[in-house]
UniProtKB/Swiss-Prot annotation:
Top-level lineage group: Eukaryota
Family: Belongs to the ergtoxin family. Gamma-KTx 4 subfamily.
Organism, as annotated: Centruroides elegans (Bark scorpion)
Name the record gives this protein: Potassium channel toxin gamma-KTx 4.8
Subcellular location: Secreted
GO cellular component: extracellular region
């Protein structure tokens, strides 16, 4: 689910949010991106 994406997904310094994005999409959200090195899902 969404919360596990935040914990699991590593967010790099320069927008490497692919892992976060994939995780969020699997959780049923539109996309994911990184804010202060944390994965955030966009519903």
């Amino acid at each position: 689910d969404r919360d596990s994406c935040v914990d699991k997904s590593k967010c790099g310094k320069y927008g490497y949010y692919h892992q976060c994005d994939e995780c969020c999409k699997k959780a049923g959200d539109r996309a994911g991106n990184c804010v202060y090195y944390k994965c955030k899902c966009n519903p």
